[in-house]
Structure formats: C-alpha cells, structure tokens
Amino acid sequence: QHAVANWKRIIEIAVDMGVPVINTEFSGDPNQQEICNGMFFKSMEELLPIIEREGIRVECQSHPYDFVELNDEACDIVKSFRSKNLGYVYSASHGFFYDQGKGDVRHMLKYAGDELTHVLLADTWNQTKDCRYIVNPPWLNQRGRADYTIHQHTAMGEGEVDFDGIFETLRDMDFANKQLKPDAPKVGGDNIICVSYFGFPEKMDQQAPEALDRIKHELL
C-alpha cells in the first residue's frame, strides 16, 4: 500500500513536470515469485487506470534478483495488460539472466515486439559460465541463481553480449522510427535507447562519445 501511494505521487509529479515516460523495475524476490506476482497485479489494478488517464508511459524492466528475471515471462506480464501506456525495457547487461545464459538477443528482442520501448546498452560476462565471476564463500558459486546475482555494466565490446545481433534486430524491428508513426503502438513519444555504463567514470570521456557514435551509425 505504501509503494502504491508513492507511485501515485510519482505520477502526479511526472504530470506536473511534463514528463511523458517513467521507467521502473519489477523488483520483488525470486524466492517468493507467486506472492510478488500477485502483489504486482494487485498494484497495477489500482495504478494502471491512473497511468492511462494521465496519458503517460510506464516502462517495466526485469533486473537480476527480481521476482521475474526471464525476458519472455517479463514481456508476457507487460503484454497481459494490453495497454498502450505500458512498455518493456530491455537491458543488454541483464540479457544472460533473461534467458539463463543463452544470450539469444535476437529472440528476446523479437519476442518483446511492440512492447519494447526502451533499450539500455552495456556489456557483461555470462554469469552461467564457469569462473566468469568468482564469489566467496565458494559454495555460492554452485547454488541456485536465486541466492545471489552478479553482472556488470561495462562498455560495449568488453564482455560477451552480442551487440551486432542487438543492433541488427532493432533495425529489423524499425525500433528507431516505430513510435514516430501515426499508428504508434504506445503513447509517450519516441522509443528510447541509451548507454548504461557503470563502474569506470574515469573512462567516460572516451567511452561515452564512442557509444553515441555507434548508436547513431547503427540506428540512424
């Protein structure tokens, strides 16, 4: 109830400021999926009518250790509302959690389809591969992924994410132009793609312009 009240206030502030898009995460606990799933839908029963009335777009992102981590399941939740006011955020650095280590970015983006309104670009290693990351105490490395999660947000090319596949699929989906058309599938204006690099601020003067140049080259 407190979270729903906070969200109502967030929506009010967004409307007052003229902000057309809010993005958020599913949150919750992967060890209590049924409870979290029920509470999410209960909350949306109250919030979605307000979101639609105000004409804003709310975008949902699955994050490692959320109650829903898999890309297709997260997309199904967004799709189930059949609302032009809800979108899906795809974070490239979470992709190995989204499909349990396969890294099939083409499938994941295509599955999202018209729900996809926001893409975050950053690289990471495949956490399902042996010794890509080493966590202590050692027994954590052999337990279920619900016990801990680890990933990175490094520059494109520094990890194992298939960015060629991401950009190729986004072009095939006409991601850059889809929301500019009269029959746009969602409200809230243009689709969004941005860089989500963390951890190395001393490299940003070089890496940020390089990322912008690549986005422009690949999509515009």
Predicted regions and their residues:
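Active-site acidic/histidine proton-transfer and metal-coordination neighborhood
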Residues: 1-90, 202-207
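Short, acidic/polar
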Residues: 2-12, 100-109, 163
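Hydrophobic pocket-lining residues that define ligand/cofactor binding sites across diverse proteins
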Residues: 14, 51, 170, 174, ...
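Hydrophobic faces of well-ordered beta-strands that scaffold small-molecule active sites
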Residues: 22-24, 58-60, 86-90, 117-121, ...
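Acidic/histidine-rich catalytic cores of soluble enzymes
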Residues: 45-155, 160
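Short active-site-adjacent structural elements
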Residues: 127-130, 201-205
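A short, acidic, amphipathic alpha-helical segment used as a generic capping/interface helix at domain edges
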Residues: 158-185
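C-terminal helical cap(s) of enzyme catalytic domains, especially alpha/beta-barrels
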Residues: 204-220
